[in-house]
């Protein structure tokens, strides 16, 4: 007999459940990853997978990355509980930027809209004044004993005579402490204000690579071993060596931002492609073009979205604190 007051639990569709937890379905992840694979990378993946022992072949007919990944799913080589093969293939292609998508966690969209800041000079002035006040307070609150201990290195300290020091020695010590304290305050005030600014680090990755690897692999990869497994391992090793020899290098650098307007301008240029266009003249030099010959070369630029979000929150908090201090001071 069913209870009259009980209600059945609501049944959720798979898409609603994934949206609630901020996850991507397997096929949606295939669309995201496969849509960012180039034709050259598709040819390389099809070549490696078709050479596997017992592989039925036919991956070379895949017209897109989505079709190739769906074919792997139909063969049972890739599913929701086993993405190991896909992870290994992306590492072989040196596409480490696509590995975070395998977690199937939906990334939050970041708006390129900029924050209204007011006068940048006034905000920097407030930051300098607040940092200067903090340094003065910290220097004045230090104990004389700690300043005396750190005022001169241990090797230069003179041995004190046993017994109580004389009044003249105590007066000279007080005068030395006062002079060292004043000198330290003048040094702190004379330092540049950039040391006290709140900054955030944004990691920029720049990589140059060939647009096509297919012709080089066809010329440099071949195996005559009779056994299928040995031939597959031989081909895989040769392909890895060829790709490593064609690595044009990459640059990873951390850029410091102390102004929110500059950070948002940098992010807006990254989203619009202006940053990529500006870096092409820096990295794709004439010497590099002469080294690669007639082959086409492209430049890949990546900025971590999590770094931008964390840095924006940090600088925005600094702007709000500076405005609050300015209001209280007035």
Curated annotation (Swiss-Prot):
Disulfide bonds: none annotated. One of its GO terms (biological process) is positive regulation of extrinsic apoptotic signaling pathway. SMART domains: DED (SM00031). Pfam families: DED, TRADD-like_N. Residues 137-147 have a biased composition (Low complexity). It is found in: Nucleus, Nucleolus. Keywords: Apoptosis, DNA-binding, Nucleus, Transcription, Transcription regulation. A motif (Bipartite nuclear localization signal) lies at residues 156-174. Residues 104-195 are annotated as: Disordered. Expression is high in liver, heart, kidney, and testis but low in brain, spleen, lung, and skeleton muscle. GO terms for molecular function: DNA binding. Residues 25-104 form the DED domain. A motif (Nuclear localization signal) lies at residues 104-109. Interacts with CASP8, CASP10 and GTF3C3. Homodimerizes and heterodimerizes with DEDD. May play a critical role in death receptor-induced apoptosis and may target CASP8 and CASP10 to the nucleus. May regulate degradation of intermediate filaments during apoptosis. May play a role in the general transcription machinery in the nucleus and might be an important regulator of the activity of GTF3C3. This is DNA-binding death effector domain-containing protein 2. It comes from Mus musculus (Mouse).
